[in-house]
Amino acid sequence: MALLASCRSKDPNTQVGACIVSPENIILSTGYNGFPVGCSDDEYPWEREGEHTKYPYVVHAELNAILNASGKSLRGARIYVDLFPCNECAKAIIQSGIREVIYLSDKYAETPATLASKRMLRSAGVTVRHLETCLSTLTLNYHKK
């Protein structure tokens, strides 16, 4: 589901999705990286470098999934994400009561933000697990009958 959610992102460089699941394996919420509601994708920059970048504006997938839960309790839940959460998302994960992070990629493993994230998650007792998969692509076939 996190991979499907990532397909909704309009970011030309990085599409990240998140899916929050209850201890009973019920999907509670999904999210993807993008601009806040009401901020047009056409009016804000998607650039990664230069004077005007996306970074001050983009809401990460994890935070969007937490906010999209709209008051549902996330205590004890798991969050599945394409990319290991940054330090800001780790704070939201911890504060929301999510107890496990399952991630697909850790491509920024040695950056200060990711190292801080790992430290906070570990200190807060949040379980972190890398999803091992042999799949390199996800293909959906839809046949209308």
Task: Locate each region found by the language model.
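Zinc-dependent deaminase catalytic domain
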Residues: 1-145
